[in-house]
């Protein structure tokens, strides 16, 4: 699986010349607002050209894929780059079908999550970055208002120095709430992906950028 870290991880390998530095952070809490220390936060996203490691041969293995265990306050932090949106290839079967239906095959910039903790329901989700032309027009119908997150550009020298960065960066904050459950089968990812996940995977695979 993806490399694991406690509290903080760098996700990208630094090789993307067009990558804008992203500081991704948040807190995992229960429905009562209490932090969940040690929560397992699995994160993955594509590069600045819309490609995912494993499916893009130009990238290193596990590039922009990490598992971060939340710290004592339930917080996780990752340094990476802002992902790009992507679409199905022009003329591919899916593109032909979508156009026949009057639809496009574009997806906005987004970041995938699995979040889990003992005694809590496993969560599969993603966030769409605000400001992308397709944020509210995702062909996979994956946009939810509460999952649209801004990428705030930070230019304050003190904030840059605190993170030991070389220049301005985009900060993305996404807090997660997990519901409590005693049911063991709800504490792990379902073996069979939901139909919408299947559709997203198929579109990504056709684009050469599968998100698995």
Regions found by a protein language model. Give the residues of each.
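Beta-strand-dominated extracellular/periplasmic modules and repeats
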Residues: 1-212
């Amino acid at each position: 699986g993806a490399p694991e870290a406690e509290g903080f991880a760098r996700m990208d390998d630094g090789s993307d010349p067009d990558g804008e530095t992203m500081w991704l952070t948040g807190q995992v809490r229960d429905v009562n607002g209490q932090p969940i220390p040690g929560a397992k936060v699995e994160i993955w996203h594509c590069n600045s050209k819309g490609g995912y490691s494993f499916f893009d041969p130009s990238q290193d293995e596990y590039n922009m894929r990490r598992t971060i265990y939340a710290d004592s306050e339930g917080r996780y932090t990752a340094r990476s780059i802002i992902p790009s949106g992507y679409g199905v290839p022009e003329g591919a079967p899916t593109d032909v079908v979508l156009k026949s239906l009057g639809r496009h095959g574009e997806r906005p910039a987004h970041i995938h999550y699995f979040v889990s903790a003992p005694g809590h329901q496993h969560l599969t989700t993603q966030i769409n970055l605000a400001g992308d032309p397709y944020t509210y027009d995702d062909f996979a119908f994956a946009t939810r208002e509460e999952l649209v997150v801004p990428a705030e550009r930070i230019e304050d020298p003190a904030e840059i120095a605190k993170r030991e960065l070389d220049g301005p960066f985009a900060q993305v904050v996404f807090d997660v709430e997990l519901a409590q459950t005693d049911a063991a089968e709800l504490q792990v990812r379902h073996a069979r992906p939901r139909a919408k996940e299947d559709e997203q995977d198929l579109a990504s695979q056709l684009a050469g950028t599968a998100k698995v």
